[in-house]
C-alpha cells in the first residue's frame, strides 16, 4: 500500500569511472536504475572492447552500456592539438568508431566544451557520427556552449543529428548566466521542431 511499481530507469548520462572498484553500483540500484549508459561527454574507456570484456568477467549490479568517446579517440589519434585532422587521422578515428560499434558501443558521445573536442569542427563530428549511425547508434553531446552560445550549440547538435541521420541526446541542456535567462524557451522550441522532423 502506498508504493509504486515501475520498470527500471535508464540513466542516459552516467560517469561510470569507479565501476571497477564498485561493481555492484548500489547507488544506481537504490535509485531504481537498471541500465546505465556510460562514456558521456566525449570520454570513456579505451581500448573499448577489452574494457567491456573486463566488466563482463567482473559482473556488475545494473546493466551497463557504453558510448565511444570522441575526445578519447581524438586524443588517441591526434593528442590535444588545436587543428583539423588530416585525412589519415580522420580515417583512423572513423576506424576506431567502427571498431567500438562492432564491439558493442551504443553510439558516440562528444564533449565539445572539453579538450580536445573543443577543437573539432562540425564536419568532423558529422563524419564520425555517420559511422555510429550506420550501426544504429545514437549521438550524445555535452554541448559546445551553455552560456551566450547556447542557441548556436543546440542548433549544431541538431545539424549533426540531421546530417548524420542519428538520434541525438543533448546533455547538460541548461542556460547559464543572467543574460541567458529565458533562452531555454528558444532552445526547447528548436528541440520540439527537430522532433517533429523525426530527429
Predicted segments — roles?
Residues 3-4, 14, 22-110, 129:
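Divalent-metal coordination cores built from histidine and acidic residues
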Residues 6-7, 138:
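Short, proline-centered helix/strand-breaking motifs
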Residues 7-17:
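Metallo-beta-lactamase
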Residues 8, 60-62, 166:
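A generic secondary-structure signal marking the coil-to-beta-strand transition
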Residues 20, 24, 43-47, 124, ...:
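Short acidic-hydrophobic sequence patches enriched in Asp/Glu that either
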Residues 85-110, 116-199:
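Histidine/acidic residue-rich metal-binding segments in metalloenzymes
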Amino acid at each position: 500500500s502506498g508504493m509504486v511499481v515501475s520498470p527500471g530507469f535508464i540513466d542516459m548520462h552516467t560517469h561510470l569511472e569507479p565501476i571497477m572498484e564498485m561493481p555492484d553500483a548500489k547507488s544506481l540500484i537504490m535509485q531504481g536504475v537498471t541500465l546505465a549508459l556510460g562514456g558521456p561527454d566525449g570520454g570513456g574507456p579505451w581500448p573499448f572492447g577489452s574494457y567491456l570484456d573486463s566488466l563482463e568477467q567482473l559482473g556488475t549490479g545494473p546493466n551497463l552500456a557504453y558510448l565511444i568517446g570522441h575526445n578519447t579517440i581524438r586524443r588517441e589519434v591526434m593528442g590535444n592539438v588545436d587543428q583539423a585532422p588530416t585525412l589519415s587521422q580522420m580515417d583512423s578515428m572513423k576506424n576506431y568508431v567502427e571498431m567500438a560499434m562492432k564491439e558493442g558501443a551504443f553510439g558516440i558521445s562528444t564533449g565539445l566544451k572539453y579538450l580536445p573536442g573543443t577543437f573539432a569542427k562540425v564536419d568532423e563530428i558529422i563524419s564520425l557520427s555517420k559511422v555510429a549511425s550506420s550501426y544504429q547508434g545514437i549521438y550524445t553531446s555535452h554541448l559546445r556552449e551553455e552560456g551566450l552560445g547556447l542557441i548556436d550549440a543546440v542548433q549544431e547538435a541538431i545539424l549533426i543529428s540531421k546530417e548524420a541521420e542519428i538520434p541525438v541526446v543533448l546533455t547538460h541542456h541548461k542556460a547559464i548566466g543572467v543574460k541567458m535567462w529565458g533562452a531555454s524557451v528558444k532552445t526547447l522550441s528548436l528541440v520540439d521542431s527537430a522532433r517533429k522532423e523525426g530527429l
